[in-house]
Regions:
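Flexible glycine-/small-residue-enriched beta->alpha junction loops
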Residues: 4, 14-69
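Active-site pocket-shaping loop/turn-to-helix segments
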Residues: 1, 24, 53-61, 74, ...
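Beta-strand segments within the central parallel beta-sheet cores of soluble alpha/beta enzyme folds
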Residues: 15-20, 79-86, 104-109, 175-186, ...
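Phosphate/pyrophosphate-binding loops at sites that engage ATP/ADP/AMP, CoA/4′-phosphopantetheine
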Residues: 69-74, 170-174, 203-217
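N-terminal extracellular/periplasmic Venus flytrap/periplasmic-binding protein-like
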Residues: 79-172
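Alpha-helix C-terminal capping segments
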Residues: 1-11, 166-167, 208-209
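Short coil/turn connectors at secondary-structure junctions
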Residues: 9-15, 44, 53, 101-103, ...
């Protein structure tokens, strides 16, 4: 959206929009270490949990927001596991078929004494089924909770970038667009149900464009 807005405003005609996430290397921190400790023990804080997965205002974990969404909309454990298994299986099939090979830039990674070419997403768990997911225990800490290590989002590292340019510049350079940006929107919801944020933004996009949800062939959720 920011790239498109820069182009629409005339501030740019080509923008590389990118982002990255490195959860596995998030450090542990001693929050008072900069100014020194007097006496007693110090506690190491997991910055991945504290800075990324915990609401800054209400201090609850992201897993609790997922539990809240389940409570609010009556989502069952069976529905969670079925959706998760289906998602894993689709991803596994897409990787096996090489659907994203042309979009992936292999990265050389040193593993022990060997250089390994990293080019496959490690996130999907091969052979995941509803049956295997149903055996996992809740990990959110909520009594009677539904969120498990199998139906929750994983701990991942990754990066992506896309080149966005004006139609005029694309024609000038002879570039064939892969897609056209039509509209974007931001939507805000209560932090305790943050998982439904895309619903609010999608409704705004539909209102701006006059489209309906049936006009979309693919929705990334």
């Amino acid at each position: 959206n920011m790239a498109a807005e820069m182009i629409l405003s005339g501030d740019a005609d080509i923008v590389v929009a990118g982002g990255m996430e490195n959860m596995s290397m998030a450090p542990y921190a001693m929050m008072k270490g900069r100014y020194g400790y007097r006496m007693g023990n110090a506690t190491l804080v997991d910055t991945m949990v504290n800075d990324a997965l915990t609401d800054a205002f209400n201090h609850y974990h992201m897993m609790i927001t997922a539990e809240n969404v389940c409570d609010k909309y009556g989502i069952t454990r069976e529905e969670l596991d079925e959706f998760s298994a289906n998602s894993q299986q689709k991803c596994e099939a897409a990787i096996a078929a090489g659907k994203f090979d042309d979009e992936i830039v292999p990265v050389p990674v040193k593993v022990k004494k060997e250089i390994v070419e990293f080019k496959k997403d490690e996130g999907p768990r091969a052979g995941t089924t509803v049956e295997t997911l149903s055996k996992l225990r809740c990990c959110s800490g909520k009594e009677g909770g539904l969120v498990t290590a199998g139906n929750a989002s994983g701990i991942n590292d990754g990066a992506a970038a896309v080149v966005v340019m004006s139609e005029e510049k694309a024609k000038e350079l002879g570039v064939k667009p892969l897609a056209t940006w039509v509209a974007g929107a931001l939507g805000g919801v209560e932090p305790e149900i943050m998982g439904v944020g895309p619903v609010a933004s999608t409704k705004k996009v539909l209102a701006k464009t006059g489209l309906t949800i049936d006009d979309f062939d693919l929705i990334e959720a």
